[in-house]
Regions:
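TM-loop-TM module centered on a large, flexible mid-protein loop between adjacent transmembrane helices
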Residues: 76-80, 240-290, 341-344
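Hydrophobic, small-residue-rich membrane helices and short re-entrant helix-turn-helix hairpins
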Residues: 141-152, 184-188, 208-237, 254-267, ...
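Membrane-water interface regions at transmembrane-helix termini and the short interhelical loops
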Residues: 70-77, 132-153, 214-217, 326-339, ...
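Membrane helical hairpin/interfacial module
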Residues: 40-136, 140
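Transmembrane alpha-helical segments of multi-pass small-molecule transport proteins
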Residues: 18-27, 55-58, 89-93, 118-140, ...
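A generic transmembrane alpha-helix motif of multi-pass inner-membrane proteins
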Residues: 164, 171, 367-440
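Hydrophobic, membrane-embedded alpha-helices of multi-pass small-molecule transporters
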Residues: 18-28, 95, 99, 165-174, ...
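Membrane-helix boundary/coupling elements in multi-pass transport proteins
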Residues: 102-107, 278-309
Length: 440
């Protein structure tokens, strides 16, 4: 691969491979290791339909989101038509989610599932400290975070997973039985959709794009090409791993109850592959968690230092993030999960709305179309998920009456209403309003 965009250096295949591996590792957290077997268990003999649904929502959608953000320039280019402070508010909220939810959860999962699963007596607190010391080591060099991950951590993670996948595919664990759900495609699509990996694209976009620039690809054309190539590498890796895990779940669909826990099912599958897999899979869990944490700590540090005009340095923010996340990780997986649902429910719909706007933005007649859709989607998300508000009678009634809300797509109707209503209001009230940012 030696494509040469005018005014820049040739695109090197090794660079694409390293960055693509790093992108893959950032998306592939331990949660992504656990849920495909469950979807396979549900899909049974119709596992190909399940894989198609998971591929569309759990692989294509997040990577497509990243590419859309890149082609628009950055997240700010999409949000600025909603309002000048939208970018800072959105990213600040997502960075808080990283610091107090997703990063601590990776740590707790790595220790409880990856380490204590093999060494039950391993001490929790010292391991938490070690986890974030290692994370900071990789994060400290701002310009080479993705490069370090792609060179050292991700190849080992991918190697372990590919070996297990190879064994699981070519030495089937059983024979898939009839699907336990009526529509395996829809079930798997919703399973992938509800992982919320689209949020990762919004959180990590700046770090991903910065890592491409750091490789010397400084023109817009080069950046976009490398981003797309890296997306393809990441897509292929995720498809191989997800597909094999889903297939292994399908192969044991006649042996386990549908209500078996996700982690319990994964452990059962690993044991059936062979006890020799327990330690390598434990390492894979730790690496999957660690690479996700490293990427998100870097994102928090980069956003915060930039937002403060570097009055707080990148390294200072990284240290603070590690400390706060470590303290939160002490709650353990169960303690963190108790408050994760409503936070996810509020943040996810506005990001999906922005994704759609990033695609169709050039066709929007005015900025009010942006404002109306995002504001109404955010209001719906608050009614649906905010503790205290979501339990009120009127909020429940509105959510229940909204089409598709039972499937997690309730935001679509408010989005369409806001888009149309905003366009009309913008036409009559703000006809003279200039378009502040054209879609790129």
């Amino acid at each position: 691969m030696n494509n040469n965009s005018s005014g820049g250096k040739a695109i090197r295949g090794l660079d694409v491979l390293i960055l693509g591996f790093a992108f893959f590792a950032t998306y592939f957290g331990a949660g992504n290791l656990i849920f495909p077997p469950q979807l396979g268990l549900n899909s049974g003999s119709d596992f190909l339909s399940g894989l198609a649904g998971l591929t569309l929502s759990g692989i294509f959608l997040p990577i497509f989101t990243l590419i859309v953000i890149g082609l628009n320039g950055d997240v700010h280019s999409i949000t600025e038509r909603v309002g000048k402070n939208t970018y800072n508010v959105l990213l600040a909220a997502l960075m808080l989610v990283c610091t107090f939810v997703s990063i601590p959860r990776t740590c707790a999962t790595a220790i409880q599932l990856g380490i204590q699963g093999n060494l039950p007596a391993a001490p929790f607190i010292p391991l938490v400290i070690a986890y974030f010391v290692i994370s900071f080591f990789f994060v400290a060099d701002q310009n080479n975070v993705m490069d370090r991950m792609g060179k050292y951590l991700t190849p080992l993670l991918a190697l372990i997973l590919v070996i297990v996948a190879f064994v699981g595919i070519f030495n089937p664990l059983g024979t898939p039985v009839a699907p336990a759900v009526d529509h395996p495609f829809v079930n798997a699509f919703l399973g992938g959709y509800n992982t919320g990996d689209v949020l990762v694209s919004f959180i990590m976009a700046a770090v991903f794009i910065s890592s491409i620039y750091g490789k010397g690809y400084t023109t817009v054309g080069q950046r976009n090409k490398v981003l797309i190539y890296c997306g393809i590498v990441s897509f292929v890796l995720l498809l191989i791993i997800y597909g094999s895990l889903l297939y292994m779940g399908a192969c044991v669909s006649g042996d386990y109850a549908q209500n078996i826990g996700r982690a319990e099912l994964l452990v059962a599958i690993i044991q059936r592959v062979g006890t020799w897999v327990m330690v390598p899979m434990g390492i894979a869990v730790v690496l999957a968690c660690l690479t996700t944490a490293i990427g998100q700590i870097a994102a928090v540090a980069e956003f915060t230092s930039t937002a403060t005009g570097n009055r707080i340095s990148y390294k200072q923010v990284a240290v603070a993030c590690c400390i706060l996340s470590a303290l939160t990780a002490l709650l353990g997986v169960d303690g963190i999960v108790t408050y994760i649902g409503w936070i996810f429910g509020i943040c996810y719909p506005p990001c999906l709305a922005l994704l759609v706007l990033g695609i169709i933005g050039r066709f929007m007649p005015n900025n009010s179309a942006y404002k109306g859709s995002v504001y109404l989607v955010t209001l719906f998300a608050l009614l649906e998920s905010l503790p205290g508000l979501s339990s009120l009678g009127f909020a429940k009634a509105i959510v229940a009456a909204t089409p598709l809300s039972t499937y997690g797509f309730g935001w679509i109707v408010p989005f369409i209403i806001g888009l149309i209503g905003g366009s009309i209001i913008g036409h009559f009230v703000s006809a003279s309003e200039p378009v502040e940012a054209e879609a790129k």
